[in-house]
Amino acid sequence: IDALTFYPLNKHTSPEDISGYLQPLVGGASMGVISEAGCPAVADPGADVVAIAQRKKLKVVPLVGPSSIILSVMASGFNGQSFAFHGYLPIEPGERAKKLKTLEQRVYAENQTQLFIETPYRNHKMIEDILQNCRPQTKLCIAANITCEGEFIQTRTVKDWKGHIPELSKIPCIFLLYK
C-alpha cells in the first residue's frame, strides 16, 4: 500500500484536479476509485472521475463488490424486479416531505421499491420525516452498516416503526419504501 498514490476526492474537487489525477491512466498505468462507504460512482463523487475518464475515451472497468443498493433490496422482502434509487433527498423540510410523498405514490402506482440514502448524521431526522409523511401501512426497510459488524436490516410498517426508532447516527444507512 505504501507504493500507492491516493488522491482526495469529494464534492469540492475540481474537474481540473480530477483530470490531473487521471494522468497516470492516460500514460498507461492502472488506477482505481474506492469509496469509504458505499459503491464508488453511485451517489458518490467517483461518478465525476468516471465521467471525465469516459470523455477522455479512457478504459473504465467496473469491479464486482458489495452494493448497499442491491443487498438492501435482497434483504428487504420488497420488489426486486422494479426498483429505483434516488440518492440523497432534499434537505429542506418542505421539499423533502414533497419528495417522500412522491416516492410513496410511485410505490403504490408503479409497484416499485423506492430507495434513498442520507448523510449518517441526518439519519434520525430522515426517519422522523418518513414516519411523519408516509402512510401508516407503507413499509419501510432500514438497512444500516451492511456487511459490517453491527449490521441492522429490518422491515416494518411506518406505523410499527413509530416509537421504535433505532440509534443510527454516524452509521451508513439506506432506506427503502414499498407496499
What are these regions (language model features)?
Residues 1, 50-51, 76-81, 133-134, ...:
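Short, hinge-like loop/turn segments at secondary-structure boundaries
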Residues 38-41, 68, 121-122:
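Gly/Ser/Thr-rich loops at beta-strand to alpha-helix junctions
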Residues 1-59:
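Class I S-adenosyl-L-methionine
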Residues 12-17, 91-94, 122, 147-151:
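A short acidic, often aromatic-flanked loop/helix-cap motif at beta-alpha or helix-coil junctions
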Residues 19, 44, 72-74, 95-98, ...:
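Short, well-ordered secondary-structure micro-motifs
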Residues 3-6, 26-30, 108-179:
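A contiguous loop/helix-start segment that scaffolds small-molecule binding in enzyme catalytic cores
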Residues 44, 48-106:
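Class I SAM-dependent methyltransferase SAM-binding "motif I" and its flanking Rossmann-like core
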Residues 35, 60-65, 116, 142:
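General beta-strand structural signal in soluble alpha/beta enzymes
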